[in-house]
């Protein structure tokens, strides 16, 4: 496949096309050997102006046919400027959870399209990191009892002497979307 790679097996030449989130997941699996739900990344090269290229759509359809129908999936953004040193983009892009295998293409198109929203453009304009492009992570969905977000520096003060965590019961999307408070 040209546009899709299994997490933990992303070739070195493609790692600059998968965004911070997918790169972190790939490294956790490949180098740290952590128990991370299996998944795939659709590279930023597959997306142009918020739309999935036709060849990439073919690859996603093939992936849909290979995924287990017993599992559901989380389809998440991994923008090239997301989770970087200068900006987190937390909650800016769309996420779709609990997606059946046959809904992966539609969910991927929705997540990729979220890169072209006013909210994301405004956030990006306020940041110094203007790197453009969005990759999409497709990962087996785990239904959590609790989930959260950990910041490696205080998002209010910017101090990095300690970690700041926010947690909610249920899915983390409730927190990052603003639909639930920690």
List each language-model region with its residue ranges.
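Short, acidic, Ser/Thr-enriched surface-loop or helix-capping motifs
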Residues: 154-155, 175
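Conserved catalytic alpha/beta cores of large enzymes that bind or transform nucleotide phosphates
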Residues: 166-182
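N-terminal beta-alpha lobe that positions the nucleotide/phosphoryl donor
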Residues: 1-137, 146
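Short beta-strand scaffold segments in enzyme catalytic cores
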Residues: 148-151
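Short, flexible loop/turn elements at secondary-structure junctions
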Residues: 79, 140-142, 155, 169
């Amino acid at each position: 496949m040209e546009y899709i790679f299994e997490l933990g097996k992303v070739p070195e030449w493609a790692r600059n096309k998968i965004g911070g989130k997918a790169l972190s997941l790939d490294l956790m699996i490949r180098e740290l050997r952590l128990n991370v739900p299996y998944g795939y990344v659709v590279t930023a090269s597959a997306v142009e102006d918020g739309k999935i290229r036709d060849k990439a759509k073919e690859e996603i359809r093939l992936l849909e046919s290979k995924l287990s129908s017993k599992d559901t999936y989380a389809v998440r953004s991994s923008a090239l400027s997301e989770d970087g040193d200068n900006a987190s983009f937390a909650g800016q892009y769309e996420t779709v959870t609990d997606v059946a295998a046959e809904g992966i293409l539609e969910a991927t198109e929705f997540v990729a399209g979220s890169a072209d929203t006013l909210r994301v453009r405004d956030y990006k304009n306020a940041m110094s990191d203007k790197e453009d492009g969005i990759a999409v992570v497709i990962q087996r969905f785990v239904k959590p009892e609790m989930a959260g977000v950990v910041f490696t520096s205080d998002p209010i003060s910017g101090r990095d002497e300690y970690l700041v965590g926010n947690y909610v019961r249920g899915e983390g999307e409730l927190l990052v979307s603003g639909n639930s408070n920690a």
